[in-house]
Amino acid sequence: MGLEEKLPSGFLLSTVETLAGYVRKGSLWPATFGLACCAIEMMSTAGPRFDIARFGMERFSATPRQADLMIVAGRVSQKMAPVLRQIYDQMAEPKWVLAMGVCASSGGMFNNYAIVQGVDHVVPVDIYLPGCPPRPEMLLHAILKLHEKIAHMPLGANREEVIRETEAAALAATPTIEMKGLLR
């Protein structure tokens, strides 16, 4: 004998955060930041075979002010890093970042001084998508995982605190060029 049985039909019990998360996850507008071959796979997700529009991403935004998801596809050079950060800063809140491909995630095979060894040293990354290049199906799966994360993201002051902690942790992480083991 739960609460659902005592309420008349037509009532829905939820919180504002849960409802806002449900609405926000279905209306992402991505700002594409295609820098290499991963961008080709990202473009193919908008085609009829994979149809990213069925997940609420009807159009890719050409301006960061109208986007809330940045898909960084490919390697980021040291000269491109300030541009990436500027575009991220121009995006309105709430905003999310998806690092598409191993080059965006960790520098990939370009382990040299000219390439940023992971975009998480420039912007906070919410979802990492491995692969060289990752298939469109993998991008769609990563977007669905991001939908789950968005649905459980707090609002207001709680969200600002989570964002500050996430960004501080990402920028304080050890650069992959300094790591030992399989990465070197």
From Swiss-Prot:
The keyword Metal-binding applies. It comes from Mycobacteroides abscessus (strain ATCC 19977 / DSM 44196 / CCUG 20993 / CIP 104536 / JCM 13569 / NCTC 13031 / TMC 1543 / L948). It comes from the Bacteria. It is an enzyme of class 7 (translocase). Its EC number is 7.1.1.-. GO terms for biological process: aerobic respiration; electron transport coupled proton transport. This is NADH-quinone oxidoreductase subunit B. It is a peripheral membrane protein. GO terms for cellular component: plasma membrane; respiratory chain complex I. Belongs to the complex I 20 kDa subunit family. Keywords: 4Fe-4S, Cell membrane, Iron, Iron-sulfur, Membrane, Metal-binding, NAD, Quinone, Translocase, Transport. It catalyses: a quinone + NADH + 5 H(+)(in) = a quinol + NAD(+) + 4 H(+)(out). It is found in: Cell membrane. GO terms for molecular function: 4 iron, 4 sulfur cluster binding; iron ion binding; NADH dehydrogenase (ubiquinone) activity; NADH:ubiquinone reductase (non-electrogenic) activity; quinone binding. NDH-1 is composed of 14 different subunits. Subunits NuoB, C, D, E, F, and G constitute the peripheral sector of the complex. Its main location: membrane. Binds 1 [4Fe-4S] cluster. NDH-1 shuttles electrons from NADH, via FMN and iron-sulfur (Fe-S) centers, to quinones in the respiratory chain. The immediate electron acceptor for the enzyme in this species is believed to be a menaquinone. Couples the redox reaction to proton translocation (for every two electrons transferred, four hydrogen ions are translocated across the cytoplasmic membrane), and thus conserves the redox energy in a proton gradient. [4Fe-4S] cluster binds at C37, C38, C103, C132. Its cofactor is [4Fe-4S] cluster.
